[in-house]
Amino acid sequence: NGINPRSIRNVWGVIKAYETYVGKRGFQPSDPVFDQIQHAGSEFGATTGRVRQCNWISMRHIKQAIDMNGVNNLVVNKLDVLREVEAWKTTDNHFQDEVGFRAYLQNELGNSMGIQKIYFSDNPYNFDEENPLTAAA
């Protein structure tokens, strides 16, 4: 039973544009922008309601996950949160704007890691009138 690994052609990875963590271990130095990201992204644990700690994405961790799982297509979510707080960084780079951030991810992941396509999700509330979402969505 199961699926032959050779029959899987497209492996999709989905990441946030920033990292989050719920728990007791230390995660990052205190920075007001992380509180802004937490608030803008509604970063609370689904079961416990505990506040998620936020940090910049680590390209090392993303590359490791892509390599380990054979990802060849990637979706980057929560760009609207970084857009709201006007902060564009990774753990090792700072960008002037969203264009630079996207170009960096495309170069670092698309070109060097062999990712076929990288999709960047925009504001989830920006839908047309034929497909509205409720405020809770």
What are these regions (language model features)?
Residues N1-A137:
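Non-transmembrane, aqueous-exposed alpha-helical and coiled segments at domain scale
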